[in-house]
Amino acid sequence: MTASKARIVFMGTPDFAVASLDALIGEGYNVVGVVTIPDKSIGKHQSIPQFSPIKQYALSHEIPLLQPKKLKDPDFLKSLKAWNTDLQVVVSFRLLPEVVWNMPSLGTFNLHASLLPQYRGAAPINWAIINGEKETGVTTFFLDYEIDTGKIIAQECIPIKETDNAGTIHDELMYLGAKLVVKTTNDILSGTVKLISQDETNLGKQKLKIAPKIFREVCKIDWNKTTREIHNFIRGLSPYPGAWTELTCVKGMTFPFKIFETEKADCHDYSLPVGTIVSDKKVYIDVRTKDGFIRLRNVQLAGKKRMPVTDFLKGNAYLLSLHF
């Protein structure tokens, strides 16, 4: 089946998904419809509709659009079936029921931002960096009954550099994933796909790691961990949602304090308790960890903008107490 004849439906929501949809359109694939989430309401009175990035793209390219609240809604299923789809492509969308993923004649495949079976779940990029992985990647696989467990179609990997954070890896995988989506689509249509089962028992010495959704309480920094662990934790949550701690002022008040960038610091007094702040109040802020000190480079005080530590110290040095 040729690219121009195959009827493809794309399902997705954020910017990460737009790159894949744009790649399919750019390669001449026949995307007959797009499915995304319902509009959100923003503004003082929740009166301003906020479109998902995928909806914005679909509207600008005049692609038919569906925005179901429930994926088993009879009206939605009727409209989806009317598109007479050959293949569905899913990137950063919701969990699909069988009645949806089993509808196309050629099936439904998903792009996942990890090297499956590792890091199944909602936040694979974050957890790979938090856990100190040296590489990650993208996987395309056919959907089945369990989350992120279907047969693998293709994978591509990239190194995680010491200077990377969740934002830089997100962008790299977004474009790498778009290329893999195009390749996977081509292989499916040409009948050249060779499927690989996800074998959790063939990981060697590696443990199976998961990537659950990240909530605010998970993002709090534990200063009792090593410098390396804290450094990976912070960059794994940067720029979003951001690792945080509580800054204790001289008056005893506490404020949420986000940290986006760090590096290993020179040694100070090892007798200092974990969480103690060491600063010249002009250039640097170092914090005692389990095995040394970590230097903060980019921070954000609650209610303020994100900024380099040198800028923060110009107006807020008086806030620093003895510890976080």
Swiss-Prot record:
This is Methionyl-tRNA formyltransferase. It is an enzyme of class 2 (transferase). One of its GO terms (molecular function) is methionyl-tRNA formyltransferase activity. SUPFAM superfamilies: FMT C-terminal domain-like, Formyltransferase. Its EC number is 2.1.2.9. Keywords: Protein biosynthesis, Transferase. Attaches a formyl group to the free amino group of methionyl-tRNA(fMet). The formyl group appears to play a dual role in the initiator identity of N-formylmethionyl-tRNA by promoting its recognition by IF2 and preventing the misappropriation of this tRNA by the elongation apparatus. (6S)-5,6,7,8-tetrahydrofolate binds at S114, L115, L116, P117. It catalyses: L-methionyl-tRNA(fMet) + (6R)-10-formyltetrahydrofolate = N-formyl-L-methionyl-tRNA(fMet) + (6S)-5,6,7,8-tetrahydrofolate + H(+). Pfam families: Formyl_trans_C, Formyl_trans_N.
